Amino acid sequence: MPSPPGLRALWLCAALCASRRAGGAPQPGPGPTACPAPCHCQEDGIMLSADCSELGLSAVPGDLDPLTAYLDLSMNNLTELQPGLFHHLRFLEELRLSGNHLSHIPGQAFSGLYSLKILMLQNNQLGGIPAEALWELPSLQSLRLDANLISLVPERSFEGLSSLRHLWLDDNALTEIPVRALNNLPALQAMTLALNRISHIPDYAFQNLTSLVVLHLHNNRIQHLGTHSFEGLHNLETLDLNYNKLQEFPVAIRTLGRLQELGFHNNNIKAIPEKAFMGNPLLQTIHFYDNPIQFVGRSAFQYLPKLHTLSLNGAMDIQEFPDLKGTTSLEILTLTRAGIRLLPSGMCQQLPRLRVLELSHNQIEELPSLHRCQKLEEIGLQHNRIWEIGADTFSQLSSLQALDLSWNAIRSIHPEAFSTLHSLVKLDLTDNQLTTLPLAGLGGLMHLKLKGNLALSQAFSKDSFPKLRILEVPYAYQCCPYGMCASFFKASGQWEAEDLHLDDEESSKRPLGLLARQAENHYDQDLDELQLEMEDSKPHPSVQCSPTPGPFKPCEYLFESWGIRLAVWAIVLLSVLCNGLVLLTVFAGGPVPLPPVKFVVGAIAGANTLTGISCGLLASVDALTFGQFSEYGARWETGLGCRATGFLAVLGSEASVLLLTLAAVQCSVSVSCVRAYGKSPSLGSVRAGVLGCLALAGLAAALPLASVGEYGASPLCLPYAPPEGQPAALGFTVALVMMNSFCFLVVAGAYIKLYCDLPRGDFEAVWDCAMVRHVAWLIFADGLLYCPVAFLSFASMLGLFPVTPEAVKSVLLVVLPLPACLNPLLYLLFNPHFRDDLRRLRPRAGDSGPLAYAAAGELEKSSCDSTQALVAFSDVDLILEASEAGRPPGLETYGFPSVTLISCQQPGAPRLEGSHCVEPEGNHFGNPQPSMDGELLLRAEGSTPAGGGLSGGGGFQPSGLAFASHV
């Protein structure tokens, strides 16, 4: 019987002869290469390629040329194949039937296809292997049966396919390895059984596949492997066990002596035993990431001379660096998220070709000398516990280009540590504890990261880094040398937006290969490198330095305008001097004991003094650093002076608001208490309230010292975050604003209630109208000035509209402390108590002084609604004459409290009951009576006399701290 090539030749001759008319000349026309009507054909010599795909065919064209070598019927609507349909296509080498609706193929469907080498039946609905049909294909080399519904492969399915080299059975419903069926494929070189439901691989499953080179078993449910599962695979080079449920390391791979690429990532393997790859000396790549590996034998990776990539992530129990003896070709080593504490001193001797060393997220504390790893190009040591860099740690690494030491605890770096790194272009020292940075050897840097080193206030000139393009420093002041003025720098957030836009553009242009996950290489080109390339292409590349200076990070002046500077100094002088005068007159010249409201007003003056002192400290810093603030800005922000300034500012402002709230509530409560109980709250309770307010204000001021908020966020040392601050930094600011806003609401409610209660009774016995009016003025002024602060704070938090840093800075420097100087001015200019207290502080020139001053002072006081009558001048003269004619013996050493003069009236004049002047019915605030010049009632505020009086010719006889007299 002739061989297949012989048969092919015979059939070719027969086809050529049949194509001519018997005994005649060739006829004009399409000839033997006529193409079926719906298909597209292409000639290849005397052979024909017919493309009938995606035409919606429901049957195979019947007029196919016998010389067709390629036939594509994929993506049609074929549901069945008739026996003998392709019998005349003796020269057909490739037949594509994928993407149809074939559920069954009869036994004689492929009869006559002796030359067929490639048969594609994927993406159909086959429920089994068309074994009888395949027996007719002795030359078949590639068979695709993937993406069908095959659940069982009979023993004789591939019988007769002795030439088959490639077999696809993936994406089916197989539950076991078709061991017996595979025994008939001795020439098979590549097979995939992926995406099935296989749960176990028995021993000797592939023992007859001695020619197999590639085996894919990924995306199954494999939990166990037999010890001899891969026995007989003497030529296997690639084994894929990824995405399974393996519980143990596949020790069966030790029989694969020619294995070069091994993948078993995304399994449940927890340990890699000692000498795990002892039988695989030709291994080049191992992928086993995304496994819960907790233990790795120290000798697991020994004697793998061909291995060039090793990636091991998340093995938390690994505390010692693996012994890589004999693994001399390793180029990329990744051991992250493990527990490695120490690197062996001989590591570089074992790995002379190492180019990339990634040891991030470990517990390394000390580094050995890496000078023997002279081919190193990238080192990643971020997120470790390294505290020192020695002189020889990175010496002689002339090829090193990128060094990442971020998120460590590095305190010191030897001055010569980087001196030999001539190729270094990227250095990352973010979030360490550096105080200085040695510059030797860093002249070629293009990207330098130093953020998070709060103790590093060192200035970096342009001459230190002539090639620098991207600089990230702890403080914006260190960016000042890279711009001539504040306008040079971009507005806050502009660079960030451009970076994001650039990232979006480049990600769409970047090849897909760079976006795919590469377990062996985490150093794909990133945005920083892209920016470096773009900057190099510019004729005059500039340095992108962050964070950028601005109004809250000035380069030259803390106060950038003379208007703000003069306003701050005016606030300082007025607040300190005026509040000091208020404190002096209230506590040194006032009556004893002090009225409760007056005591609170004095406490407010003390709080305002603290605000003035804090503003004075800022003004002094501006004066001392005039024109060169960037040289001292970092030290000022991190120093004790800034924290003290912020503490005083918050303590003063919060105490002022809380004490003002207390004063308003005290006035309102006094009215209610007098009406209900006949007496007002005592001075002791008010003092307790003052202490509570001061304690609450002190707590608020101390929170930023405990890292709740921050005083050093800006050189103003206030916890109010600038507009570009992080949302987390705004939390403390918003809390303060909301608390103060609540206090002003309480104040408003208290005074509304107070004025509603005024017409309901006669409260002149406990009423000090001047102080109540003064508190009302304080509420109005302070509330009005606090509105811009609250508005800008909420606008920044909610993002209602963009707020310029200049506006925020002006409000914080001028508007926020303005009540500290306005409050005492209101007291000094409009409150009659100040003049009374000031007179008491003056030296007494004569005996009549105290009484005269008391009487004159009471004349200057006016009532809330003009119902408290003024004392007639004749009565004052009477008192003055009496004091000059005969001086009582005890009057010289007696200190009188402030005196309220109330006229006793006729008819229906008030009667004296004890120490109170009681009006008859119908005589209230709105119904005054004519006064009598000869009768006066002198009564001390807030005190009750025991008795006694002033007779016509006698002297004063005071009792206790108060006196009453009826003339």
Swiss-Prot record:
Intrachain S-S bonds = 642-717
Localization terms from the record: Cell membrane
Protein's UniProt keywords contain Transmembrane helix: yes
Q: Which residues are glycosylated?
A: 77, 208
Q: What does this protein do?
A: Receptor for R-spondins that potentiates the canonical Wnt signaling pathway and acts as a marker of multipotent stem cells in the epidermis. Upon binding to R-spondins (RSPO1, RSPO2, RSPO3 or RSPO4), associates with phosphorylated LRP6 and frizzled receptors that are activated by extracellular Wnt receptors, triggering the canonical Wnt signaling pathway to increase expression of target genes. In contrast to classical G-protein coupled receptors, does not activate heterotrimeric G-proteins to transduce the signal. May act as a tumor suppressor.
Q: What is this protein called?
A: Leucine-rich repeat-containing G-protein coupled receptor 6
Bilayer-spanning residue ranges: 568-588, 599-619, 645-665, 688-708, 728-748, 775-795, 810-830
The record, for InterPro entries, names: GPCR_Rhodpsn, Gphrmn_rcpt_fam, Leu-rich_rpt, Leu-rich_rpt_typical-subtyp, LRR_dom_sf, LRRNT
User: In what residue span(s) does the LRRNT domain sit?
Assistant: 26-66
Please report which protein family the annotation says this sequence is part of: Belongs to the G-protein coupled receptor 1 family.
Q: Which gene encodes it?
A: LGR6
